[in-house]
Amino acid sequence: MPRRIDRAARKAELVEALWSVIHHHGVSAVSLRTVAAAAGVSVGSLRHVFPTRSALLTSAAELMIDNVTRRVRAVPTDQSALAYATEVLLHLVPTDSASRAEMEINVALIAEAGADRGLLRIRDRARNELYRLCRRLLARIRPDADEERLDERSRRLHVVVDGLAFHLVQERPGTSRRWARSVVEEELRAWSASAD
């Protein structure tokens, strides 16, 4: 009897190969052929899971969001609102080699979004989810905050997180990133101490 291949495991292996191609050669090098070669499978085998380049890129972006979501959900909630928010936000920026590689790929996929509707939808969804997350974290710190002020500070925090992530991904590998925690903590403390 032929061996059944676990489709989810195969999909993850192929996306990992895609990430490798993007990380080493850039998103312009992505094709079914280059990803199949990186994964050590035939193009036909790859097409059974991902029929098009767009399907491959979209799946990679979705997996990246799933990975970040999993890390955020793993943050213990039994801590102060400030500590919890800090830990959650630090999972959204590249603070180690794995999250740096992931962010580099994320930036490449965002750049490709203008040419791919699937990536554009995912980019917009991720942006909206990040805003909502920032808003929930700030509301947790100050449950009595004025709605308009909360919206304003949520946009600001969203920009800080995006800018911090983009800045960190450009730092040289091995450079200390401890200062990133201070940026996040200072932003959250300023919100905690502010009056409406």
What do these predicted ranges mean?
Residues 13, 17-24, 70-71, 105, ...:
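Solvent-exposed, amphipathic alpha-helical segments
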